[in-house]
């Protein structure tokens, strides 16, 4: 590629202008109706909600999200039947792994740490830069007090002791993304110390860690982010100084983890905690949270009581990368030591999809960074009244919310954890809104005696929000399926409004529509093809459930039993009731009759009565 002209670079660096040459405009996807027309005959529209069969042109190619790439790779590996390697194990016989983690998280603030410039991640490059951000002569740091609030919430969520007095230090190094030649951090006197976080078996920790494991948090400190580097052709790098000076917290754990999976779970849980308390709403998938891991190994025979030489793996950007990088580095160190070679202290890198780490540079020590107190910034004094207020107003912890979802709402531990983790907690807010609307609609229409058991519909709502909404974006949903659903932090879904889903599930709970009709109605909502509301769509298309009468159940059961003498004999001779054979006969009833008008429980009841009668004859 030709070198980028100096004029183009100047426009970018000085005014944030980007050449739009080569941009590809997105094509618009053709719409089609998921609802049958009211003018179509009842025979074609009644009972079922059909999707139009007209040919739809394929959508334009879209970048595949990283999460989907990882899932696809895992499925492919499983399909090919790859054998587990040594690195797949959480332990290696004769060796102990020790891991410590440093997490860098961007705080949810409107201003930078030491300048009034706004924080922005999507605006034009270099459009939010103050003089101090560029270290212009004569500019001075001005601590933005509001940045302290989310930092304190994060430290409290991690059970840290807040220090009344803390100070800022300069960490010296020279690189193009740090114009001042040093980073302002809190190396000697951080604002929070001595925290801890407890990981439970349901969080997904390694089985070797038992039911729970508690990891110490050494300290939490405030610091600045660096500029964003955009690599170009011919070894040219562009810099976006919008990010320089953005407030970060660095969370440093104690080296107390001994299994790769547990370390990955720790990062995921800290990310969830920070989002819950509104300290960091941008996760690893968007670059708002990065992890560095320190890895060392030693023999378990007692020949080396002290920890081994540690290496640091920098800038891991996914949960999976944390686990995979630790496994790869552990196995590398063991191989080196078994070959009689020493492990140098160094910084290493990791590439997604790789099976080994790579050397970046020798490990820089404390002397190299020349830490010194920053003489331009006054000590940070934090009052007990502020800490007490934030502690009282802190959001419910994910563990407490998980217990509530399981005990009160009847969700499984796996579903409850998914609900909390999806969309950084926005999906669980959506769940509460939909469930509240369903409950209010039921209470308005039914007497107290008629009201169904709470858990019977709370679990239904949960299953639909976790599983049925997820199916909307899979390849099975057809060419109009989007990559992801969009949720706001308040719990609003842009594609499936909570009011529409609540109305749909209300009719399903009342057994006024079948599950199949409900699923196709949901897809119609997703495509924005419903006009006049859910109830009107059901009415216009004659989709109300009309169950067959009792005598038709009896007739279907009799027809199914004909020619099944061998199966029926098992109901006469059994020692243990053959439930599987019963469901086989019920399945034949469903296929023989009008499926959309049959209640499976009623079909099972009628068939059970008939086969039990055989034994008494």
From Swiss-Prot:
Protein name per the record: Glutamyl-tRNA(Gln) amidotransferase subunit B, mitochondrial
Role, per record: Allows the formation of correctly charged Gln-tRNA(Gln) through the transamidation of misacylated Glu-tRNA(Gln) in the mitochondria. The reaction takes place in the presence of glutamine and ATP through an activated gamma-phospho-Glu-tRNA(Gln).
Transit peptide start and end: 1-56
Biological process terms in GO annotation: glutaminyl-tRNAGln biosynthesis via transamidation; mitochondrial translation
Subunit structure, as described in the record: Subunit of the heterotrimeric GatCAB amidotransferase (AdT) complex, composed of A, B and C subunits.
Compositional bias (Basic residues): 76-85
Region (Disordered): 53-90
GO cellular component: glutamyl-tRNA(Gln) amidotransferase complex; mitochondrion
A GO term for molecular function: ATP binding
Pfam families: GatB_N, GatB_Yqey
Family per record: Belongs to the GatB/GatE family. GatB subfamily.
EC number: 6.3.5.-
């Amino acid at each position: 590629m030709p070198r980028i002209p100096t004029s183009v670079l100047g426009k970018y660096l000085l005014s944030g202008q980007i050449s739009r040459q080569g941009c590809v405009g997105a094509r618009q996807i053709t719409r089609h109706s998921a609802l049958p027309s009211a003018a179509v005959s009842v025979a074609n529209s009644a009972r079922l909600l059909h999707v139009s069969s007209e040919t739809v042109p394929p959508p334009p190619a879209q970048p595949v999200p990283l999460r989907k790439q990882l899932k696809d790779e895992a499925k492919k590996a499983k399909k090919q039947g790859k054998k587990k390697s040594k690195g797949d194990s959480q332990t290696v016989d004769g060796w102990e792994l020790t891991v410590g983690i440093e997490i860098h998280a961007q705080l949810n603030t409107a201003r930078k740490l030491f300048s009034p410039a706004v924080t922005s991640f999507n605006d034009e490059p270099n459009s939010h830069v103050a003089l101090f951000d560029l270290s212009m002569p004569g500019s001075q740091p001005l601590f933005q007090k509001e940045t302290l609030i989310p930092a304190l919430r994060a430290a409290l969520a991690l059970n840290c002791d807040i220090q009344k007095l803390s100070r800022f230090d300069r960490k010296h190094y020279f690189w193009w993304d740090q114009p001042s030649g040093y980073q302002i951090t809190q190396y000697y006197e951080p604002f929070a110390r001595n925290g801890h976080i407890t990981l439970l078996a349901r969080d997904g920790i390694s089985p070797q860690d038992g039911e729970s494991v508690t990891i110490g948090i050494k300290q939490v400190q405030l610091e600045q982010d660096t500029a964003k580097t955009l690599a170009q052709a011919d070894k040219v790098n562009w810099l976006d100084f919008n990010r320089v000076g953005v407030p970060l917290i660095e969370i440093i754990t104690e080296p107390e983890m001994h299994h790769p999976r547990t370390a990955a779970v720790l990062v995921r849980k800290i990310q969830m905690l920070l989002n819950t308390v509104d300290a960091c709403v941008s996760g690893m998938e968007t670059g708002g949270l990065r992890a560095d891991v320190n890895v060392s190994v030693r023999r378990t025979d007692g020949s080396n009581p002290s920890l081994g030489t540690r290496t640091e793996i920098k800038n891991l950007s996914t949960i999976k990368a944390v686990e995979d990088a630790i496994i790869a580095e552990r196995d590398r160190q063991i191989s080196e030591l078994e070959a009689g070679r020493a492990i140098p202290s160094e910084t290493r890198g990791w590439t997604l999809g790789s099976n080994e780490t790579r050397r970046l540079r020798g490990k820089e020590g404390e002397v190299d960074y020349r830490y010194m107190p920053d003489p331009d910034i006054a000590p940070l004094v934090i009052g007990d009244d502020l800490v007490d207020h934030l502690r009282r107003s802190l959001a419910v912890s994910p563990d407490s919310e998980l217990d509530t979802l399981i005990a009160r709402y009847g969700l499984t531990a796996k579903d409850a954890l998914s609900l909390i983790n999806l969309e950084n907690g926005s999906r669980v807010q959506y769940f509460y809104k939909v469930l509240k609307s369903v409950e209010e609609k039921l209470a308005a229409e039914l007497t107290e005696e008629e009201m169904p058991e709470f858990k019977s519909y709370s679990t239904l709502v949960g299953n639909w929000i976790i599983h049925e909404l997820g199916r909307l974006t899979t390849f099975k949903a057809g060419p109009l399926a989007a990559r992801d659903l969009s949720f706001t932090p308040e719990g609003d879904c842009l594609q499936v409004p909570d009011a529409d889903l609540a109305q749909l599930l209300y009719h399903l709970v009342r057994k006024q529509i079948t599950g199949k009709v409900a699923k196709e109605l949901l897809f119609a909502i997703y495509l924005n093809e419903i006009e006049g509301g859910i109830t009107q769509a059901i009415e216009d298309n004659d989709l109300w459930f009309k169950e067959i009468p009792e005598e038709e159940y009896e007739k279907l059961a009799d027809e199914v039993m004909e020619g099944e003498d061998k199966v029926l004999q098992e109901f006469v001779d059994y020692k243990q009731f053959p439930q599987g054979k019963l469901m086989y006969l019920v399945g034949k009833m469903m296929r023989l009759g009008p499926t959309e008008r049959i209640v499976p429980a009623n079909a099972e009841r009628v068939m059970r009565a008939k086969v039990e009668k055989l034994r008494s004859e």
